[in-house]
Amino acid sequence: MRYLPLTPEDRAEMLARIGVASVDELFVDIPADKRETALPRLALHKSELEVERTLARLAGQNVPAGSVPFFVGAGAYRHHVPATVDHLIQRSEFLTSYTPYQPEIAQGTLQYLFEFQTQVAELTAMEVANASMYDGSTAAAEAVLMAHRVTRRRKAVLAGNLHPHYRSTIETVSRYAADEVVALPPAPFGEEDLITPIDDTVSCVVVQSPDVFGNLVDLKPIAEAAHKAGALLVAVFTEAVALGLIEPPGAQGADIVVGEGQSIGNALNFGGPYVGLFATRQKFVRQMPGRLAGETVDAEGRRGFVLTLSTREQHIRREKATSNICTNSGLCALAFTIHMSLLGKTGLTRLARANHAAACDLADRLAAVKGASVVNDTFFNEFTLRVPGPAADVVEKLAAKGILAGVPYSRLAPKSGLDDLILVAATETTTEDDRAAYAAALKEVL
């Protein structure tokens, strides 16, 4: 496709249409001394070899997660991904394919989406799941909007121990939808009161388990209180591996279950792309966002797969759409599906137990260090460590010793006042030597 630049007449017509007299007036918000009036003189291009060397030098400033003892979590977790996963998702049939609008030539894609949905539904103990969302936080925001549609109410209650990034995503979406959000304060040291705020004006209560501090939450009394008030319970998780060991949200009364699927089949990927999981009850399926792949038979009675539901704004009237999701996270969903298939139910449980055992061992070691304490009574593979003084300083000192010790909670919520807390994760990738090194280094810096 050729690039045809604007003519002076084209530019004048466009400026007149938006009500400005010149390009300078269009960019009046940018200080004059910050504007470039001519293209900068760029250095001559380098050879491919020189570019590779330059990028390698820059990359060398990073600390790869696998090169040091690594205990960072807070919503994204380092797990071992079998080589089979990466090998299969790089097949051109999957890597380059787009939305399967033509089922007659996209049966492979539709079938893996169907299998993905089945796995997510079984993992969460729900009746139906969609073909993925962008990530966990946007899935949570879509869940709140869905709850508003189902209940015809506009008020959501967010647990204080919901991940701050999930909270801010929900608040951003709600702000532009003119919805009300009641966000409770974080409560890392005790059980949250999530029942008192629920009344007959609330559409949903959003609860994370394991929560951002690592606590396991009993969802049953919250679900009972929500249903009694005519509201829905939206259950959130950031660590999908936990569902291999704990009671799934669907079995505890959740109406919508959303979460992050990154930790199964997907690497940390420098923060993305990730894959949002979304499951709900069958009776709410027509209010569910995204796409739904379904099983059917063709004219000759052969089994096949199609997009059963796809009520997004590209397909129907915008005001009737349940979401405006576009390409979603299909390749990440495929990676999730392959890894889950390799694990199986027994393998997932074994993986979850290994994670829990590693975290328990680490918690015991760190709690024995004078000045440090673990604030959780129950947790899966992540817990909260309380240290004297600013947690960010402790994390920096440990990093200087080659230990990536975790995430200061203040980094996620700078105004929370909880400056002495570190979120610490231990997965199957952490070794006993790693955990011993952490405890020894912590003893030195406190």
Curated annotation (Swiss-Prot):
GO terms under biological process: glycine decarboxylation via glycine cleavage system; nucleoside metabolic process
EC numbers on record = 1.4.4.2
Query: Which InterPro entries does this chain map to?
Result: GcvPA (IPR023010), GDC-P_N (IPR049315), GDC_P (IPR020581), PyrdxlP-dep_Trfase (IPR015424), PyrdxlP-dep_Trfase_major (IPR015421), PyrdxlP-dep_Trfase_small (IPR015422)
Where is coiled-coil annotated? none
Q: Which UniProt keywords apply?
A: Oxidoreductase
**Could you tell me which Gene3D superfamilies the record lists for this protein?**
Aspartate Aminotransferase, domain 1, Type I PLP-dependent aspartate aminotransferase-like (Major domain)
| Stored Pfam families | GDC-P
Catalytic activity annotated for this protein?
Answer: N(6)-[(R)-lipoyl]-L-lysyl-[glycine-cleavage complex H protein] + glycine + H(+) = N(6)-[(R)-S(8)-aminomethyldihydrolipoyl]-L-lysyl-[glycine-cleavage complex H protein] + CO2
Mind listing the GO molecular function terms for this protein? Answer: glycine dehydrogenase (decarboxylating) activity
Which EC class, in a word? oxidoreductase
Kindly give the HAMAP family that the UniProt entry links to this protein.
GcvPA
Q: How does it assemble?
A: The glycine cleavage system is composed of four proteins: P, T, L and H. In this organism, the P 'protein' is a heterodimer of two subunits.
What is the stated purpose of this protein?
A: The glycine cleavage system catalyzes the degradation of glycine. The P protein binds the alpha-amino group of glycine through its pyridoxal phosphate cofactor; CO(2) is released and the remaining methylamine moiety is then transferred to the lipoamide cofactor of the H protein.
Family, per entry: Belongs to the GcvP family. N-terminal subunit subfamily.
Spell out the protein name for this chain.
Answer: Probable glycine dehydrogenase (decarboxylating) subunit 1
